[in-house]
């Protein structure tokens, strides 16, 4: 179900940090297609499945989840105008990475927190 406001606009606006833009520019085209699909879901779906977006425990951050074959990509998100991403109208994509292990999360969360400051 795609939900837009009465004028047909997206539910959420997405903003991109320089770090995310740099990461995205280096992706292969088939990976970019999956990223675009997931970003469209965030823009237009009111309720977001944990298949695509998940809250990071003990943080005010979320992760966008993109799977391409056996590769798992993650992008750290920040809901700008509400603590809950579902109620947020503005979402900032902070930094993206190819998930290799759970150790990656600690490093990437620190990078995301630095970007927010």
Tell me the role of every PLM-derived stretch.
Residues 94:
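Conserved catalytic cores of phosphodiester-cleaving nucleases, focusing on short active-site segments
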Residues 78:
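Short, charged interaction patches at domain edges and termini
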Residues 1-72, 82-90, 98-117:
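Basic, Lys/Arg-enriched alpha-helical interface segments
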């Amino acid at each position: 179900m795609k939900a837009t406001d009465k004028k047909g606009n997206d539910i959420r606006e997405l903003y991109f940090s320089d770090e995310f833009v740099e990461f995205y520019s280096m992706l292969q085209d088939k990976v970019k297609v999956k990223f675009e699909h997931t970003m469209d879901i965030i823009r237009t779906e009111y309720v977001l499945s944990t298949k695509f977006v998940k809250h990071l425990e003990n943080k005010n951050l979320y992760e966008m989840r993109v799977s391409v074959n056996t590769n798992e990509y993650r992008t750290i998100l920040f809901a700008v105008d509400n603590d809950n991403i579902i109620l947020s109208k503005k979402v900032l994509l902070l930094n993206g990475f190819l998930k290799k292990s759970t150790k990656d999360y600690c490093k990437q969360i620190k990078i995301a927190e630095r970007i927010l400051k």
